[in-house]
Amino acid sequence: MARPLILVSNDDGFRAQGLRALADAIRRFADVVVCAPETEQSTTSHSLTLTRPLRLREVAPAVFAVDGTPADCVYVALNGGTRVLPRMPDLVVSGMNHGLNLGTDVFYSGTVAAAREAALRGIPAMAASADVGAERDAAAAACAKLAESLVSLAPISPEPAASVPPPFRRKVPAPLVNVNVPPGSAWPVASTRLGLRLYEDIVEFRQDPRGREYLWIGGGGVRHEELAGSDTSAYDRGAISVTALLLDLTSAGDSVLTQRMVTAVPSS
């Protein structure tokens, strides 16, 4: 039986130790191609670079760098013919991120966005993140085992009929999983939902030596709301969280609100 082909990306850049550890662990059961950002792209979310040209370079055999965002990297790999991949991958894994992507972090995370870009294009995908206090090789091995499980349980969506033009093939969303590893070197594993990860949001105004104002934004302290079965609760009790993410963001529970809004607007 042929070995699976797995595309590995991240948002920390192709030199990141977490990516290298995870790619090495995945090579135990699959062939790996890496396509990752040239530089760190944390918190770039799902942005694509459309206002300037991108550059792609092969920095080592089957290791590619793109001077763009994580989503750019996966987009280029999946749509660039055989420049990066010899064929469509069986799975895309993004990570292993240096730091967590719990709860609402998924909306900002470049790590999660790289995986989401693949899922939008019909390729099963997994985002993997580890606490800075996690033992790297052990965390990578745990994430690789979950990736191996996913690639066997969620095979790629069937190829559409030959009559479908190639640019529009494999557009059916595929499974998307978010994995977070807490501190330590051995962990239980839990199937979870997204939790609530709340930051002390800060805007800090400063002045440069010439008296011109500049500012920094970002979260300060962080706390987790207690929510049974959540990824944040799993983290707090020392368990690896495995969370399935939806690509359909429709809030069915708010349909009454939107219907009332529509009713309140006179027809033109």
Residue spans of the language-model regions?
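A cross-family phosphate/adenosyl-ligand binding-site feature
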Residues: 2, 6, 16-87
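Glycine-rich phosphate/pyrophosphate-binding loops
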Residues: 119-142
